[in-house]
UniProtKB/Swiss-Prot annotation:
It comes from Alternaria alternata. Gene clusters encoding host-selective toxins (HSTs) are localized on conditionally dispensable chromosomes (CDCs), also called supernumerary chromosomes, where they are present in multiple copies. The CDCs are not essential for saprophytic growth but controls host-selective pathogenicity. Although conventional disruption of ACTT2 could not be accomplished due to the high number of the copies identified in the genome, the high sequence identity among these copies of ACTT2 is likely an advantage for RNA silencing, because it allows knockdown of all copies of this gene simultaneously. Keywords: Hydrolase, Peroxisome, Virulence. Its EC number is 3.1.1.-. Pathway: Mycotoxin biosynthesis. GO terms for cellular component: peroxisome. Induction: Expression is positively regulated by CSN5 during infection. Belongs to the AB hydrolase superfamily. AKT2 hydrolase family. This is Abhydrolase domain-containing protein ACTT2-2. A motif (Peroxisomal targeting signal type 1) lies at residues 260-262.
Length: 262
């Protein structure tokens, strides 16, 4: 794939983007993580109670109007256009009511799809549906321990009122991300920074989409892609423009240099 490639992810998506940046090293020129679900064991999924929240969340309503009213109440802080899109795409008519003008509706994504983000569905392997110990997904904690292996500049974009990106969490993210020097090329600099969107919570991209988009665009345009175009991209072009003969000659000279150093 042609660089630069920018990774952007929110919440669990931020954790997944960060994980991809480590498992597929240098796939991203930069990444922007919006309130990512990344943290040490004491901030892991087992401590957040997300499974309980999912089980309590309503998934069916008698009419589409009832569903819309409930969603507008639950997500009243969201930008109106974003909320309209949520309502448009997140509910559908139940099979028995498709032919009716109005009738029961359900969430497009049920509880199971959300629960497996938080708790491992161990019954898939064991076949034992009940009676097993609950095991929470470890992705956010795993990624926390891999933050030092990140190989691209990173922006943490956080909600000022978020209960996930607390000052302590942000301090850990900034201090640990891309910290391991052995994974850097000589002279390589990686920028790790944060931006805070005031008066927003964990759902900051849904609450203030324009402000989030402006911050992301500014980071990409003025900072990271400019750095990539001026340095990394230029270096790659120098190599690509060489003939095969010159590439081979450079490799041989490099080998001779190593022999004098090693």
């Amino acid at each position: 794939m042609q660089q630069p490639i920018v990774g952007v992810g929110h919440s669990m998506g931020g954790c997944q983007i960060a994980t991809l940046s480590v498992t597929s090293r240098r796939i991203f020129s930069t990444m922007i993580l919006l309130d990512p679900a990344i943290g040490p064991p004491e901030m892991g999924l087992a401590t957040l109670g997300l499974g309980q929240l999912t089980l309590r969340r309503r998934t069916q309503w008698l009419t589409r109007e009832d569903a819309e009213k409930a969603l507008r109440t639950s997500f009243s802080t969201w930008d109106p256009q974003v909320l309209d899109l949520l309502i448009k795409h997140s509910i559908h008519s139940d099979k028995q009511s498709v032919e009716m003008e109005d009738g029961p509706v359900s969430l497009v994504t049920g509880r199971y799809q959300e629960l497996v983000n938080y708790i491992k569905p161990s019954f898939i392997r064991s076949g034992k549906v009940v009676g097993q110990e609950l095991v929470h997904q470890t992705g956010p904690v795993d990624m926390y321990h891999m933050l030092g292996l990140v190989t691209c500049s990173t922006l943490y974009l956080c909600g000022g009122e978020s209960t996930l990106s607390t000052p302590r969490a942000r301090e850990l993210w900034l201090s640990r991300t891309a910290e391991l020097s052995y994974s850097k090329d000589p002279g390589e600099m990686r920028k790790v920074d944060e931006r805070i969107v005031p008066d927003t919570g964990h759902f900051l991209p849904m609450e203030e989409p324009k402000e989030c988009a402006d911050i992301i665009a500014d980071w990409i345009d003025k900072d990271e892609c400019m750095i990539w175009n001026c340095h990394i991209g230029k270096q790659g072009k120098i190599w690509r423009d060489l003939s095969n003969t010159n590439r081979k000659m450079n490799a041989e000279v490099w080998i001779e240099y190593l022999q004098s150093k090693l």
